[in-house]
Amino acid sequence: MIKQRTIKKEVKARGVGIHSGSVVNMTLIPAKEDHGVVFRRMDVGGKLVRAHSAFVNEVVLSTGLENQGVKVSTVEHLMSTFSALGIDNVLVELDSFEVPIMDGSSAPFIFLVQSAGIKEQDAYKKFFVIKDTIRVENGDSWAQVSKYEGFKVSLEIDFDHKKVKESGQKLSINFSKQCYLKEISRARTFGYMKDVEMMQRQNLALGASMDNAIALSDDDVLNEDGMRYQNEFVKHKILDIVGDLYLLGSNLIGHYEGYKTGHLLNNQLLSVILAKPDTWSIETFEEEGSPIQFYSEDWKNSL
């Protein structure tokens, strides 16, 4: 049977918080079976916030969690990493209210987990298996999940910007066949420089810079190093989706499809899914019959 996973040893990282602009210290700590992903805010007495849809309180520009007044913001890139590497159980210590943004992708977090090492545990890994189609809509935007033997994300974005249009706004990734590490993990968040400058005048997005995002002028990419992928914009949105879906508490087996989606619509979809327990099941799988192949340390995989 496929087993649950944690990390082999404690590992630390430091980075800037995109909201505060302050340095954030983060420590990943191995956790016991069935612990799940849990955040611990060391700056407020070690209070805990579980990484689950039930605790989502923020869906504007990023995904944030809250438990009894204690918040953890911008969790989606780290959650995307845990999903891709099959990490079920880990304690994430922070000395601030937000996960550090690093370079705006999940690649630094992938490296961090790989540096810690991945440990299989004794308990069987639980998968969230979609059995029926569930759909949510908001204006002309929509998102749905349906039954599928594996994990697949199909997305179309619609940004009225020359470079985004040129890069391709539609993509489907079958994670049973295509590698998250090579195809998705290095895709960075993006936004208009004029919007960032406006927010910073209001003391918002103080940590945002070209070191952690693709900065757009009205018609071009401002970063000197250009793009990491030809279609980096839509790939980053898929990275976000993988992270948001992991707030179900287990790796999803199903096909996510969306048009002009974001954190709000993703969270609405999770809420509807969880409210309809007859449309999904929690299952375990034999290694040979697994619909998902997770990263293994003996893979010849590099970023």
Curated annotation (Swiss-Prot):
GO MF annotations, alphabetized: metal ion binding; UDP-3-O-acyl-N-acetylglucosamine deacetylase activity
EC number: 3.5.1.108
Annotated Gene Ontology cellular component terms: membrane
One Pfam family of this chain: LpxC
A biological-process GO annotation: lipid A biosynthetic process
Active-site residue numbers: 263 (proton donor)
Cofactor dependency: Zn(2+)
Annotated pathway: Glycolipid biosynthesis; lipid IV(A) biosynthesis; lipid IV(A) from (3R)-3-hydroxytetradecanoyl-[acyl-carrier-protein] and UDP-N-acetyl-alpha-D-glucosamine: step 2/6
InterPro entries registered for this protein in UniProt: Ribosomal_Su5_D2-typ_SF, UDP-acyl_GlcNac_deAcase, UDP-acyl_GlcNac_deAcase_C, UDP-acyl_N-AcGlcN_deAcase_N
Keyword entries, A-Z: Hydrolase, Lipid A biosynthesis, Lipid biosynthesis, Lipid metabolism, Metal-binding, Zinc
Catalytic activity: a UDP-3-O-[(3R)-3-hydroxyacyl]-N-acetyl-alpha-D-glucosamine + H2O = a UDP-3-O-[(3R)-3-hydroxyacyl]-alpha-D-glucosamine + acetate
Residues annotated as binding Zn(2+): 77, 236, 240
Family: Belongs to the LpxC family.
Biological role: Catalyzes the hydrolysis of UDP-3-O-myristoyl-N-acetylglucosamine to form UDP-3-O-myristoylglucosamine and acetate, the committed step in lipid A biosynthesis.
Name of the protein this chain belongs to: UDP-3-O-acyl-N-acetylglucosamine deacetylase
Originating species: Ruthia magnifica subsp. Calyptogena magnifica
Lineage, broadest ranks: Bacteria, Pseudomonadati, Pseudomonadota, Gammaproteobacteria, Candidatus Pseudothioglobaceae
